[in-house]
From Swiss-Prot:
This is Calsequestrin-1. CDD domains: PDI_b'_Calsequestrin_C (cd03074), PDI_b_Calsequestrin_middle (cd03066), PDI_b_Calsequestrin_N (cd03065). Pfam families: Calsequestrin (PF01216). Detected in skeletal muscle (at protein level). Detected in skeletal muscle. It is a peripheral membrane protein. Its main location: endoplasmic reticulum. GO terms for cellular component: endoplasmic reticulum; mitochondrial matrix; sarcoplasmic reticulum lumen; sarcoplasmic reticulum membrane; Z disc. Residues 1-22 form the signal peptide. Keywords: Calcium, Endoplasmic reticulum, Glycoprotein, Membrane, Metal-binding, Mitochondrion, Muscle protein, Sarcoplasmic reticulum, Signal.
Length: 420
């Protein structure tokens, strides 16, 4: 979580109630002024962990003396206070840990990244790597409160499972909840909860529909219809965890508000292949289907990972992205972005009538992976432009010098005439 995101989030909070009052049932919560966020110290951290089913801690850098730093911290606190108010009856607590004043308790709890939120539930610690806004944080914590494994008992639950295609998911078929193999599956689910959904069924008909054998676990990449079966069933917790770590970077993944920083930091050699497409837009939807087909065709390529961003999920970032990348987000785009300096190169799609075909997109991606398309080339072009500008300046200087010499000669001639 970075400073600008906090400012935008707080702005959203302040603007939420500027409109006319809604009817009963549609009123957004307003902060009631009660202090619920606690300062965590060596004296009270154990009591706080026992008191709350879920405890969310903001590990922050020391507050600066300047007005801007203090104002920003106040906005961060406001976000936490509103979230704490909304989730008060759910058994969720919120706290603050200063990285300097509370270094001892931070070390005991394993907090190491400033401006991050750490969530504690049972014996698990989850780092929240999403947008710092009250609504996104509340949604994430409600997911944390859910059980790590969701059961599929019939056709309706099965349909919901099949419709979930924009994030990785697992499903296993077990004898019952008392099965040792299910227990291992459940323990693995707790380690990835709530970022990766785990499903289980004890129903033979559901298992048959999914072509699952007893104690078998299938893993689905995002946007893939065909699963990968975890080998060597029945699987231990370690085998499941190791498998997911090996497959942690899907071929195509969606940038989501609740995990956006984690996704962005997981780059390949300092770059991301980024696709912008609005799913609700006809062109965006068509382009997304092309990208999905390319991803499924290349699912075995460990060097390929595409991040899909639906601009509608991040409306406050649209002007920034358009200015930074020099693209119009009302149209689909795919390009290479350097994660260090955000330099980018975008696939040429000037023809508004035709989107690239699957083959054309695969050829472009192949050029990217082979290094023929990269952001350094764009830098070289900029350098060439600068060199051209310098040459022009030199030419202008030479011309000016020549003009000055001519003027001097004219002056000398005039002086000679005067002497005569």
């Amino acid at each position: 979580m970075k400073g600008p995101w906090l400012v935008l989030a707080a702005l959203c909070l302040s603007l939420a109630n500027l409109g006319p009052r809604g009817e009963d049932g549609l009123d957004f919560p307003e902060y009631d002024g009660e202090d619920r966020v606690i300062h965590i110290s060596l004296k009270n951290y154990k009591a706080a962990l026992k008191k709350y089913e879920v405890l969310a801690l903001l590990y922050h850098e020391p507050i600066g003396d300047d007005k801007a730093s203090q104002r920003q911290f106040e906005m961060e606190e406001l976000i936490l206070e509103l979230a704490a108010q909304v989730l008060e009856d759910k058994g969720v607590g919120f706290g603050l840990v200063d990285s300097e004043d509370d270094a001892a308790v931070a070390k005991k709890l394993g907090l190491d990244e400033e401006d991050s939120i750490y969530v504690f539930k049972d014996d698990e610690m989850i780092e929240y790597d999403g947008e710092f806004s009250a609504d996104t944080l509340v949604e994430f914590l409600l997911d944390v409160l859910e059980d790590p494994v969701e059961f599929i008992d019939g056709s309706h639950e099965l349909a919901a499972f099949e419709n979930l295609d924009d994030e990785p998911k697992l499903i296993g078929y077990f004898k019952n909840e008392d099965s040792e193999h299910y227990k291992a599956y459940e323990d693995a689910a707790e380690e990835f909860h709530p970022y990766i959904p785990f499903f289980a069924t004890f129903d033979a008909k559901v298992a048959k529909t999914l072509t699952l054998k007893l104690n078998e676990i299938d893993y689905y990449e995002p946007f893939h219809d065909e699963p990968i079966t975890i080998p060597s069933k029945p699987n231990s917790e370690k085998e499941i965890v190791d498998f997911l770590h090996q497959h942690k970077r899907p071929t195509l993944r969606k940038l989501r508000p609740d995990s956006m920083y984690e996704t962005w930091e997981d780059d390949l050699n300092g770059i991301h292949i980024v696709a912008f497409a609005e799913e609700d837009d006809p062109d965006g939807y068509e382009f997304l289907q092309i990208i999905k087909e390319v991803a499924e065709d290349n699912t075995d390529n460990p060097d390929l990972s595409i991040i899909w961003i639906d601009p509608e999920d991040f409306p406050l970032l649209i002007p920034y992205w358009e200015e930074k990348f020099g693209i119009d987000l009302s149209r689909p785009h795919i390009g290479v972005v350097n994660v260090t300096d955000a330099d980018s190169v975008w696939m040429d799609m000037d023809d508004e009538e035709d989107l690239p075909t699957v083959d054309e997109l695969e050829d472009w991606i192949e050029d990217v992976l082979e290094g023929e398309v990269n952001t350094e080339d764009d830098d070289d072009d900029d350098d060439d432009d600068d060199d051209d500008d310098d040459d022009d300046d030199d030419d202008d200087d030479d011309d000016d010098d020549d003009d000055d010499d001519d003027d001097d000669d004219d002056d000398d001639d005039d002086d000679d005439d005067d002497d005569d």
